[in-house]
């Protein structure tokens, strides 16, 4: 918003058969508070193509072991998100996409890595016949650094209260799933670093 202007920002959310809707409700509320346009794109068939714990509520959430990905990995999800964002962007004249992936923490999902982002930028540019720029400002930040960025922007409390991470869809966080642990540990680490300085 600061870099491009409120009227140049469209927040996108995706419905892909995820087990809860709380993240969509949080996104709607954040977009309204920030006074930016918000569009929801439906990709429901993704849940039919991939059996994982984010789209199958009968599966318990498990961390990956021995180099495997956690069962929360949805193959190709970020590729689809970026493809659909670029298609929508083309209709409104937008060539810059911003995505909040980070490769520094947790699972090392392949579609959160920098080489994937660079590859998608090239692929989308070729597919649309024009230069597409993908920004991933959190790419190399761990969770503590992301909390620090929120604090530097004067939005730490707001982000803590309004953003959503829990895989189980618990508003305040379940304090059990890997996403909650990562979020809580990152905030705890950031606050500890603040006390040391």
Give residue ranges: language-model regions.
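ATP-dependent adenylation/nucleotidyltransferase module used to activate substrates
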Residues: 1-156
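Immediate flanking context of iron-sulfur cluster ligation sites
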Residues: 154-175
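Iron-sulfur (Fe-S) cluster-binding segments and ferredoxin-like electron-carrier domains
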Residues: 172-197
């Amino acid at each position: 918003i600061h870099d491009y202007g409120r009227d140049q920002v469209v927040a996108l959310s995706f419905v892909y058969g995820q087990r809860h809707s709380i993240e969509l409700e949080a996104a709607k509320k954040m977009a309204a508070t920030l006074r930016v346009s918000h569009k929801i794109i439906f990709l429901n068939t993704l849940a039919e193509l991939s059996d994982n714990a984010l789209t199958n509520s009968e599966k318990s959430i498990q961390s990956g072991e021995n180099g495997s990905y956690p069962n929360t990995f949805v193959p190709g999800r970020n590729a689809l998100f970026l493809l659909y964002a670029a298609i929508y962007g083309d209709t409104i004249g937008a060539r810059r996409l911003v995505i909040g992936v980070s490769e520094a923490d947790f699972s090392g999902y392949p579609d959160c890595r920098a080489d994937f982002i660079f590859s998608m930028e090239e692929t989308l540019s070729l597919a649309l016949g024009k230069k597409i720029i993908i920004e991933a400002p959190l790419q190399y930040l761990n969770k503590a650094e992301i909390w620090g960025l929120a604090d530097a922007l004067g939005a730490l409390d707001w982000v803590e209260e309004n953003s959503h991470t829990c895989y189980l869809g618990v508003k305040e966080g379940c304090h059990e799933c890997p996403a909650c642990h990562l979020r809580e540990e990152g905030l705890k680490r950031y606050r500890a670093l603040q006390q040391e300085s």
